[in-house]
Amino acid sequence: MHSATIGVIGGSGLYAMPDLKNPEEVRLTTPFGDPSDAFIIGELEGRRVAFLPRHGRGHRLNPSEVPARANIYAFKLLGVRALISVSAVGSLREDYAPGHAVIPDQIFDRTKGIRPATFFEGGVVAHVAFDRPFCPYLSNILLHAAQAAGAVVHQGGTLVVMEGPQFSTKAESEENRRRGHSLIGMTALPEAKLAREAEIAYATLAMVTDYDVWHPEHDAVTAEQVIKVLSANVNLSQQIVRHAVAQIDENFTSPAHDALRYAIVTHPDHIPAAVKERLAPIAGRYWS
C-alpha cells in the first residue's frame, strides 16, 4: 500500500508538483466514489507527499462537482496527517492585492447545501468542533514558508466559500465586505469540515487573483483574469509548498488529530456493521 504523511491538494492553476522525486501515479477508490484524479506520490524535502489536483487534470470538475468526501477519505487511506490546500481566491480587502498570498484563520459557509458535507450518516452521528477550522501549526508554517519564498503574505482573515461556479454579483460582494470578510472562494468547504472529521490537520494557502467585483478601480473578475494571475504565480505557489513541507515535523500533534474523541454521539452497539466497515479508516479506533 502506498503511503504519505503530508498531502497537498492543488486548486485552480496548480495541477502538478514537478519537484516531487520518484513520483508514482496511484489511483484509489473509496466508499464515497473516486477522487478527483490519480494521486501523485513522491518525495519532497525528504518527506513522503501525496498530491491531488482538486479539479482533476485538465480542470474537469466545477466546484460543486469536486468529490470532497472521496478526496479526503483517500488522503486518510494514504496515512496523511497534514493537508495543505492551495486555493485561488478573490480579495474583499484593498490591502490583500492580486498576487499576494493569504493564510486565512476563519471560514464562512455560503454554499447551498448540495455538497455532501459529512462522513457520518446512515446510522451514525458525529458533531466535531470547528471553531478553529484551520490548524494553527500548519497555518504558521505556511506563513513562514510564504515569507521564505519571497511572497507578499498576509496572516488571518475570513474566507467566504460560495457555491459558484458563477462569480459574485456586486450586491453579494458588497454584503461580504460589510460583514468584514476578507476573501472569497468556492472550494474550501466542505473540504475543511471533512478533513476535521477525518482527523487530518488542514490549512489553506490562499492565492489572491482578483478583487472580486467590488473594487471601483478594477474590472470585475473573469476566468481569464484568474488564470492569468495564477499562471504568473504558479512557481511561487510551488516554492511556498516546498518550504512548508520542509518545515513540517512529521510527528507533530494537532487538536484535529483527536477531533472525533468526543464527537461521535451514536453508541457503537447501534451503529450498523456496514457503516462501521465504511468508516473504519476514519473512526474505527473509537469502536474497535
Curated annotation (Swiss-Prot):
Substrate binds at M186, D210, Y211, D212. One of its GO terms (cellular component) is cytosol. Pfam families: PNP_UDP_1. InterPro entries: MTAP, Nucleoside_phosphorylase_d, Nucleoside_phosphorylase_sf, Purine_phosphorylase-2_CS. Pathway: Amino-acid biosynthesis; L-methionine biosynthesis via salvage pathway; S-methyl-5-thio-alpha-D-ribose 1-phosphate from S-methyl-5'-thioadenosine (phosphorylase route): step 1/1. Phosphate binds at S12, R54, H55, S87, A88, T187. One of its GO terms (biological process) is L-methionine salvage from methylthioadenosine. Its EC number is 2.4.2.28. It catalyses: S-methyl-5'-thioadenosine + phosphate = 5-(methylsulfanyl)-alpha-D-ribose 1-phosphate + adenine. GO terms for molecular function: S-methyl-5-thioadenosine phosphorylase activity. Keywords: Glycosyltransferase, Purine salvage, Transferase. The record marks S168, A223 as: Important for substrate specificity. Catalyzes the reversible phosphorylation of S-methyl-5'-thioadenosine (MTA) to adenine and 5-methylthioribose-1-phosphate. Involved in the breakdown of MTA, a major by-product of polyamine biosynthesis. Responsible for the first step in the methionine salvage pathway after MTA has been generated from S-adenosylmethionine. Has broad substrate specificity with 6-aminopurine nucleosides as preferred substrates. NCBIfam families: MTAP (TIGR01694). Belongs to the PNP/MTAP phosphorylase family. MTAP subfamily. PANTHER family: S-METHYL-5'-THIOADENOSINE PHOSPHORYLASE. Homohexamer. Dimer of a homotrimer. This is S-methyl-5'-thioadenosine phosphorylase. The gene is mtnP.
